[in-house]
Structures are given as C-alpha cells and as structure tokens.
C-alpha cells in the first residue's frame, strides 16, 4: 500500500471516531479553497478534507478563498516620490504611503525615505490606511472577554496556555501563562487539533 493510501486510511479511521461537525459535501478528488488554505476532498465530506494549515485572517479572506481587499501590490512609493515637486520643511518628518521620510533640503523629491513596498489599495499618500488594520487573533484577548465560569483554585487549559481559576470563579479573571497560541493547532480546551481538520474552526 502506497504512502498516500496509508495516510488517507489513517485519516479516515481517525475521523470515523469523531462526530461530523461540518456535514457539507464536496466532489471526491476536487480541490477547493477554505479562506487562505488549499484543500483536497478525498471522501466526499468537506469536514474530512486534507487542508493546509495557514492562519487565515478573516478580516482579509472570505470563506471561498477570495480576498475582501485587493492583493498587495509591488509598487514602490519612493519611485513616485522622486517626481514630487511639493515643498517640505528641512528636518521635518512625514509619511509617504507606508514609508517614513525626512525632508532634507525643502523638496519632498529629495527627502530621505524608507523603501518599503507600499500597497496603494491599502495606504493613502499621507500614510493613513484606507481601511482598519486587521487585528491579530490572540487567545488572551479572547479569554478576557469570556463569560465562562470555572471552579476557584482549579487548573485548566485555555488553548496552549495553563490557567488557575481565581476566587472570582471566572475564566476571564484566571491567572494564565501568556504563550501565543495558534488556534489552527489548538482547541480551546487545550487539546490539539487533528492535522486534517477543516480550517473552519468549531469550538
């Protein structure tokens, strides 16, 4: 039996003991997108699909793999700034798209600037963003918003962190370690996700 066949058999066996969370079907042998991840349907059940495990920012990606905003370009603002004949005050600091600049001799075209590639679909010329910067998911931020209760003095896991419940009996008030947890690898109860789990999270 080939390696792929063995891998699929192991995956199928593992899922047989697990309740189906997402019963949607997919065409066997087809490839599909799930947010920023690429998936392969091998048994017709979408929840069993083999998927990459990138952490997809849902402020950027739709579930079907399309982007909510245009893909960042490779345009360099410095090239356009060289054509800029606007005046500036020597010594003044200013933003030009995503770059930081310092005026040298009174002309913006001669300013000294960082050379990052700026996406004009994201940044305005004055350095402000056209839409809010996506917030990185953080297990600690989520825990502190939790309305769940816990037994005072009890130890528990919250994603990859170890916690001790305080006298208040609230998960949000517990004392926890502060590791950065990948929610595509960890479940809220501290157990690890199977590597084949569909990246749509069901906690």
UniProtKB/Swiss-Prot annotation:
PROSITE patterns the record matches: PACIFASTIN
Q: Please report any disulfide bonds recorded for this protein chain, giving both cysteine positions.
A: 26-41, 36-56, 39-51, 88-103, 98-118, 101-113, 150-165, 160-181, 163-176
Q: Name one GO molecular function term.
A: serine-type endopeptidase inhibitor activity
According to UniProt, the tissues expressing it are described as: Expressed by the venom gland.
Decide whether keyword Disulfide bond is in the record: yes
Keyword field contains Secreted: yes
Q: Ranges for the Pacifastin domain?
A: 23-59, 85-121, 147-184
Q: Where is this region: Disordered?
A: 129-150
Which residue positions does the secretion signal occupy?
1-19
Chief location category: secreted
The record's subcellular location field reads: Secreted
Please give the SUPFAM superfamilies that the UniProt record associates with this protein.
PMP inhibitors
Question: Which stretches are tagged as biased composition: Basic and acidic residues?
Answer: 129-148
Q: Which family does the entry's similarity section mention?
A: Belongs to the protease inhibitor I19 family.
- Name recorded for this polypeptide: Pacifastin-like protease inhibitor cvp4
